[in-house]
UniProtKB/Swiss-Prot annotation:
It comes from the Bacteria. Disulfide bonds: none annotated. One of its GO terms (biological process) is gluconeogenesis. ATP binds at K197, E319, G345, G346, D347, T348. Gene3D superfamilies: Phosphoglycerate kinase, N-terminal domain. Its main location: cytoplasm. The lineage of its organism: Bacteria, Pseudomonadati, Thermodesulfobacteriota, Desulfovibrionia, Desulfovibrionales. Its EC number is 2.7.2.3. This is Phosphoglycerate kinase. Belongs to the phosphoglycerate kinase family. It catalyses: (2R)-3-phosphoglycerate + ATP = (2R)-3-phospho-glyceroyl phosphate + ADP. GO terms for cellular component: cytosol. It comes from Nitratidesulfovibrio vulgaris (strain ATCC 29579 / DSM 644 / CCUG 34227 / NCIMB 8303 / VKM B-1760 / Hildenborough). GO terms for molecular function: ADP binding; ATP binding; phosphoglycerate kinase activity. Monomer.
Length: 393
């Protein structure tokens, strides 16, 4: 992808505005997962070691725009960064008129959503943020699908606008998986509702060689194939759409395989009994909550023969142990496959971590919504503006 990269620039002595995604989950002021901070650390260290004067910018949560709210302060993030970097990382509340930072040092700017105009992507705020730096570095893939002042407008007006190492790695992995994949290309799409991933399913059904569907989404395809789904979650109005997608995949020389067997239960609850059924034998009072062992074996064969795997969403309700075997088997198959694999989305990342295969997945995306929108074939505004700036340089 034609963007300027931070790694290609001389940062020494330059004021670098580094947009990261440090939107971490908090409980009673404590960080419950530092995954996003850890993902950003290499870029922060790289900029500092290059002698840049680094101003780190991020959002956190959804405060009322333009108003300071202690509950959404980045103070816990500043403390965490200080520990990780082994130096005091100052949290600057009033930074919009400029901040003095020494070469090779960094400060953390307070939650950018406290500034009026951030969400509306105003030119005024974009210009003011751009005035803080010599180089703007967009490194927050998780926010790349949002056109906001700190991801988009600032890139229009900064003297130089480039992609940080984390964003560049995300784009390289996605391009490798979708634009120049080694075939067979296999997509795995799970989740509860077809309606939330219709664009994604439509886009991938024309591009992949095989599309494995799981979770509540699969129930629509099971129904479209002529089987009963009992009390399972499905969307009656989208069964015809599922049939169309299956036909479209076949017409393109691909396939959306329907499960051979499933795991059912009377309800989704702790202690609910789990029973394996042929897909043709689901009872009227049963819910499909996972794929069965024969299906897991079939999907494993498909994944081991793949050249590229793109994965978004589990195939069962893996949060409940008795309905997690299918997702576990899928995790292990992706990990064992010689294919280049990319996984993204909160539930998917949680699954690969739960089953201990994260280190054997080719690339784990840090973006939820951005990952999904890229797979849907949509333009990511924060990336598009970097491409535009690169074309002008």
């Amino acid at each position: 992808m034609a963007v300027i990269k931070m790694t290609d620039l001389d940062l020494k002595g330059k004021r670098v505005l580094l947009r990261e995604d440090l939107n971490v989950p908090l409980k009673e002021g404590r960080i419950t997962s530092d995954k996003r901070i850890r993902a950003a650390l290499p870029s922060i260290r790289m900029a500092m070691e290059a002698g840049a004067r680094v101003l780190i910018v991020s959002h956190l949560g959804r405060p009322v725009e333009g108003e300071f709210d202690e509950a959404f302060s980045l103070a816990p993030v500043a403390a965490h960064l200080s520990r990780e970097l082994g130096r005091d990382v100052r949290l600057v509340k009033d930074y919009i008129d400029g901040v003095d930072v020494a070469e090779g040092d960094c400060v953390l700017c307070e939650n950018v959503r406290f500034l009026k105009g951030e969400k509306k992507n105003t030119e005024e705020l974009g210009r003011r943020l751009a005035a803080l730096c010599d180089i703007f570095v967009m490194d927050a893939f998780g926010a790349a699908h949002r056109a906001q002042a700190s991801t988009h407008a600032v890139a229009r007006f900064a003297p130089v606008a480039c992609a940080g190492p984390l964003l560049a790695a995300e784009l390289d992995a996605l391009e490798r998986a979708l634009d120049a994949p080694k075939h067979p290309l296999v997509g795995i799409i799970g989740g509860s509702k077809v309606s939330t991933k219709l664009t994604l399913l439509d886009n991938l059904s024309h591009r992949v060689d095989r599309l494995i569907v799981g979770g509540g989404i699969a129930n629509n395809f099971i129904k479209a194939a002529g089987y009963e789904v009992g009390k399972s979650l499905y969307e009656p109005e989208l069964v015809e759409e599922a049939a169309r997608l299956m036909a479209a995949a076949r017409a393109a020389g691909g396939e959306i395989p329907v499960p051979l067997d499933v795991v059912v239960g009377p309800e989704l609850a702790d202690g609910a009994p789990a029973t394996v059924r042929k897909v043709s034998e689901v009872g009227p009072d049963e819910m499909i909550l996972d794929i069965g062992p024969a299906t897991a074996t079939r999907y494993r064969e498909i994944l081991l023969a793949a050249g590229t795997i793109v994965w978004n969403g589990p195939v069962g309700a893996f949060e409940w142990e008795q309905f997690g075997a299918g997702t576990r088997a899928l995790c292990e198959a992706v990990a064992d496959s010689p294919a280049f694999s990319i996984a993204g989305g909160g539930d998917t990342v949680a699954a690969v971590e739960k089953y201990g295969v994260a280190s054997r997945v080719g690339y784990i995306s840090t973006g939820g919504g951005a990952f999904l929108e890229f797979l849907e074939g949509k333009e990511l505004p924060a990336v598009a503006i970097l491409q535009e700036r690169a074309a002008q340089s």
